[in-house]
C-alpha cells in the first residue's frame, strides 16, 4: 500500500489525466497511455533514475526538468505533461513512483477504452482470460513464471487471445505479465478487472456457482447487491461443480458463502465435535 504522500501525489496526476481525457479523442488517449507505460518500463530498468526523481533534496521543478530533459522528443507532449506533474510532487519511495507511473498508464488505457465504448467488453475479456488461465495449471505456471522472459510470455498470451480479445485487452494482459503493482499475474489480472469496473463506477462481485445463473437470477442478484453497496454491481461468474449448489459471492473483502458444500462441511464439523 502506498504511503499517504505518494497517494496524494498520484491523485494530483490522476486528476490531471481526467482533465486531459475529457477533451481528447480515444486514439490520442491510447497513444498517451503507451507513452506512460513506456516510461514506467524505463523506470523499472533504471533504479538510479527512480531514486533521482524522488530525491527530496531536489525541488519539484528540478525533478520535472530532469525528466523532461531525458524524455524530450521521445514521448508526446500530453504524456510529458502528466509525467512531469507526477515527479514534481513528493513520493515516499522510488518503487512507489514506479507504481504511480504504471498505474497512470493503465488508467489512460482504460479511459481510452471507455471513450471508445469498449470498456465493458475489455473488463469481461480480462476476466474470462483469467478464468482460462486459472483453470489450466500448466498454462498458469508458464504465464506466471518470473524466470521466463516477459516478451516470451506476452507472445504466448497474444497467440491465445488472437481474434478473441480487443487490442487494449491484450495490452493490459501484457501489463499483468509484467507484475502490475508487484502482483502475481493472476492477481494483476484481478486488479485490472476491478480498475476497469471502477472506471465505469461499478463494483465487482465474484460469484461461484455449480451451474451458470439464468438471466433473471443474475438480474435479481445484481439488484440485491447494488442495493446493499449503494453502487451498481457487475457480476463475474465462475462455475465450479464441486460447490454442489447454492452460491458464493465475494465483493471486496466481504464473502457470502451460501453453497451446499459449505453447509455440508459445517454439518461434518458439527458431527465431529459430538
From Swiss-Prot:
Example of a GO cellular component annotation carried by this entry: plasma membrane
Pfam family, one: OSCP
Main location: membrane
Keyword set, alphabetical order: ATP synthesis, Cell membrane, CF(1), Hydrogen ion transport, Ion transport, Membrane, Transport
Subcellular location: Cell membrane
Domain of life: Bacteria
Complexes and interactors: F-type ATPases have 2 components, F(1) - the catalytic core - and F(0) - the membrane proton channel. F(1) has five subunits: alpha(3), beta(3), gamma(1), delta(1), epsilon(1). F(0) has three main subunits: a(1), b(2) and c(10-14). The alpha and beta chains form an alternating ring which encloses part of the gamma chain. F(1) is attached to F(0) by a central stalk formed by the gamma and epsilon chains, while a peripheral stalk is formed by the delta and b chains.
Purpose: F(1)F(0) ATP synthase produces ATP from ADP in the presence of a proton or sodium gradient. F-type ATPases consist of two structural domains, F(1) containing the extramembraneous catalytic core and F(0) containing the membrane proton channel, linked together by a central stalk and a peripheral stalk. During catalysis, ATP synthesis in the catalytic domain of F(1) is coupled via a rotary mechanism of the central stalk subunits to proton translocation.
Protein name as catalogued: ATP synthase subunit delta
Organism: Salinispora tropica (strain ATCC BAA-916 / DSM 44818 / JCM 13857 / NBRC 105044 / CNB-440)
Gene: atpH
Amino acid at each position: 500500500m502506498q504511503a499517504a504522500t505518494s497517494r496524494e501525489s498520484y491523485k494530483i496526476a490522476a486528476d490531471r489525466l481526467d482533465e486531459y481525457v475529457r477533451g481528447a479523442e480515444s486514439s490520442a488517449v491510447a497513444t498517451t497511455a503507451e507513452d506512460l507505460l513506456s516510461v514506467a518500463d524505463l523506470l523499472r530498468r533504471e533504479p538510479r533514475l527512480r531514486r533521482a526523481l524522488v530525491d527530496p533534496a531536489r525541488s519539484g521543478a528540478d525533478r520535472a526538468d530532469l525528466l523532461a530533459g531525458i524524455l524530450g522528443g521521445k514521448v508526446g507532449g500530453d504524456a510529458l505533461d502528466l509525467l512531469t506533474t507526477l515527479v514534481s510532487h513528493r513520493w515516499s519511495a522510488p518503487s512507489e513512483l514506479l507504481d504511480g507511473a504504471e498505474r497512470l498508464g493503465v488508467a489512460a488505457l482504460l479511459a481510452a477504452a471507455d471513450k471508445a465504448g469498449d470498456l465493458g467488453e475489455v473488463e469481461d475479456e480480462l476476466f474470462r482470460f483469467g478464468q482460462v488461465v486459472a483453470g489450466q495449471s500448466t498454462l498458469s505456471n508458464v504465464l506466471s513464471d518470473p524466470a521466463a522472459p516477459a516478451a516470451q510470455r506476452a507472445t504466448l498470451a497474444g497467440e491465445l487471445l488472437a481474434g478473441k480479445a480487443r487490442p487494449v485487452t491484450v495490452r493490459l494482459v501484457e501489463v499483468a505479465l509484467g507484475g502490475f503493482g508487484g502482483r502475481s499475474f493472476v492477481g494483476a489480472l484481478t486488479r485490472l478487472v476491478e480498475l476497469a469496473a471502477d472506471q465505469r463506477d461499478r463494483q465487482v462481485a465474484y460469484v461461484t456457482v455449480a451451474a451458470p445463473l439464468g438471466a433473471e437470477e443474475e438480474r435479481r442478484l445484481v439488484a440485491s447487491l447494488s442495493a446493499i453497496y449503494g453502487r451498481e454491481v457487475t457480476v463475474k461468474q465462475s462455475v465450479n461443480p464441486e460447490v454442489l449448489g447454492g452460491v458464493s459471492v465475494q465483493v471486496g473483502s466481504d464473502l457470502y458463502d451460501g453453497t451446499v458444500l459449505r453447509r455440508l462441511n459445517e454439518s461434518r464439523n458439527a458431527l465431529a465435535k459430538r
